[in-house]
């Protein structure tokens, strides 16, 4: 009797909801919030769980960026393609970063969250923000540009500086383009290494619920829900403004480019919850790059747009800066003319680039902006220090979504978006049908990346 061994494989049954990463992270956030609220000391003690997860992710970011960019650029084959992607990406970044600043400025003038507080600047404890102010003075646009160049090639990876790794990767990728066929063995080697590195990303993402649990328990335990109540108008205004920016502004951009912002958010829900839990958009950077490529964006575009966007396309941080600056002015009864507000916006445009990539960038950049615009008292930052931690989650999520949208849009502009695959993946029809991203000719089936994907 002949047995047919060529029959089509049986479709995999859908996994139970509790095995999806987004559900696990959501449960972890809720559990962390409860622990932090009812057992604050225990919540604070769980901080190492969140810190450890962030360190694990940062450990893998440099190789992910380097390998993605180098193999992507080598695949382009020409320097013209590199210049085209970079030009369109920075055009997008400048446009929407500026728009985010304007939205924050308009919202602050309309809602006026600081009006009626009547705070005397002299009564504020400026020592609380002294460290942030000193860091702001240390950072400058020139220093930022010089910091992009690493002391050595290896120091970029040792320090984990995203922009330095990006700089080295672009130079190396261009070098491979210029040597042509001689570079093919190197590209093949890096393709193989990237396969293993992205499998590591899958493994690390399985620890995401633990990291989110520890980080959120610490946040609630240390700062408490009560600290938000006193400045609820500011926090609420910021969350509302960020939501409107994502839905209206970014949503319109998505619509004009033929896709839905809500479907994109649904596709990235696990990563968004991870960003919420850890208050760090960086924690989801490797996973974002993987998912954008899986959705049909060309690797070369993903490799250039996502890492640079993390420094130059900070929509959430920009909304926060102008909104917080005007809140401080209103709370301290400091009247700003239209010209002064425009100056504030222009300074914020520059300082947001000069302080990119710095730990606590949002608060430091605000200090840098206020120090250049002396009309608004820097000491007023003490007013928002207690709730800044609760606004950082919203900043990070808005930054994250903004960079995801930028990647898809620039890919479409470049003709580097597989539209059929993109629609299928965002429509939830991908299942196991999408080919492995980092496929290797002849690689054993068990080595395929997406089989180990947490979500």
From Swiss-Prot:
Xref: Gene3D superfamilies: Sodium:dicarboxylate symporter
Molecular function GO labels: fumarate transmembrane transporter activity; malate:proton symporter activity; succinate transmembrane transporter activity
Functional note: Responsible for the transport of dicarboxylates such as succinate, fumarate, and malate from the periplasm across the membrane.
Matching NCBIfam families: PRK01663.1 (NF002461), PRK13027.1 (NF009587)
Name this protein carries in UniProt: C4-dicarboxylate transport protein
Highest taxon in the source lineage: Bacteria
Lineage, opening ranks: Bacteria, Pseudomonadati, Pseudomonadota, Alphaproteobacteria, Rhodobacterales
Subcellular location field: Cell inner membrane
Spans traversing the lipid bilayer: 20-40, 59-79, 91-111, 160-180, 209-229, 231-251, 344-364, 367-387
Alphabetically ordered keywords of this record: Cell inner membrane, Cell membrane, Membrane, Plasmid, Symport, Transmembrane, Transmembrane helix, Transport
GO annotation (BP), single: L-aspartate transmembrane transport
A Pfam family the protein falls into: SDF
Record membrane topology: Multi-pass membrane protein
InterPro entries documented for this protein: C4_dicarb_transport (IPR023954), Na-dicarboxylate_symporter (IPR001991), Na-dicarboxylate_symporter_CS (IPR018107), Na:dicarbo_symporter_sf (IPR036458)
Family (UniProt): Belongs to the dicarboxylate/amino acid:cation symporter (DAACS) (TC 2.A.23) family.
GO CC terms: plasma membrane
Gene of this entry: dctA
């Amino acid at each position: 009797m002949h047995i047919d061994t060529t029959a089509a494989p049986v479709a995999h049954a859908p996994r139970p909801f509790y095995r999806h990463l987004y559900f696990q992270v959501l449960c972890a956030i809720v559990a962390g919030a409860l622990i932090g609220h009812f057992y604050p000391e225990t919540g604070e003690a769980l901080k190492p769980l969140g810190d450890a997860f962030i360190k694990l992710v940062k450990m893998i970011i440099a190789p992910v960026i380097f390998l993605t960019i180098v193999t992507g650029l080598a695949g382009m084959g020409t320097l013209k393609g590199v210049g085209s992607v970079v030009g369109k990406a920075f055009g997008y970044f400048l446009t929407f970063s500026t728009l985010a600043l304007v939205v924050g400025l308009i919202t602050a003038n309309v809602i006026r969250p600081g009006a009626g507080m009547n705070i005397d600047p002299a009564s504020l404890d400026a020592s609380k923000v002294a460290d942030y102010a000193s860091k702001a003075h240390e950072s400058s646009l020139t220093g930022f540009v010089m910091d992009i160049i690493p002391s050595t090639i290896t120091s970029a990876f040792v320090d984990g500086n995203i922009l330095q790794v990006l700089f080295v990767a672009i130079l190396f990728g261009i070098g491979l383009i210029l040597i042509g066929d001689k570079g093919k063995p190197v590209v093949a080697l890096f393709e193989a290494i990237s396969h293993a590195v992205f499998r590591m990303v899958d493994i690390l993402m399985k620890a995401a619920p633990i990291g989110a649990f520890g980080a959120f328990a610490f946040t609630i335990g240390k700062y408490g829900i009560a600290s938000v109540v006193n400045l609820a108008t500011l926090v609420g205004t910021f969350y509302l403004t960020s939501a409107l920016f994502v839905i209206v502004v970014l949503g319109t951009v998505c619509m004009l480019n033929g896709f839905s912002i809500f479907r994109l958010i649904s596709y990235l829900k696990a990563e968004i919850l991870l960003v919420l839990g850890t208050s760090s958009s960086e924690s989801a950077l490797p996973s974002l790059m993987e998912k954008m490529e899986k959705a049909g964006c060309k690797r070369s575009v993903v490799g250039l747009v996502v890492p640079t966007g993390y420094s130059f396309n900070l929509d959430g941080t920009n909304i926060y800066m102008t909104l917080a600056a005007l809140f401080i002015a209103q709370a301290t009864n400091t009247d700003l003319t239209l010209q002064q507000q425009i100056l504030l916006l222009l300074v914020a445009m520059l300082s947001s680039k000069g302080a990119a990539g710095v730990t606590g960038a949002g608060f430091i950049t605000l200090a840098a902006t206020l120090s250049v615009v002396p009309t608004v008292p820097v000491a007023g930052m003490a007013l928002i220090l207690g709730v800044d931690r609760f606004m950082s989650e919203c900043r990070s999520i808005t930054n994250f979504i903004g960079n995801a949208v930028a990647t898809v849009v620039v890919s479409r502009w470049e003709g580097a978006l597989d539209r059929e695959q993109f629609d299928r993946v965002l429509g939830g029809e991908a299942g196991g049908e999408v080919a492995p991203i980092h496929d290797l000719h002849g690689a054993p089936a068990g080595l395929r990346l997406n089989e180990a994907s947490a979500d």
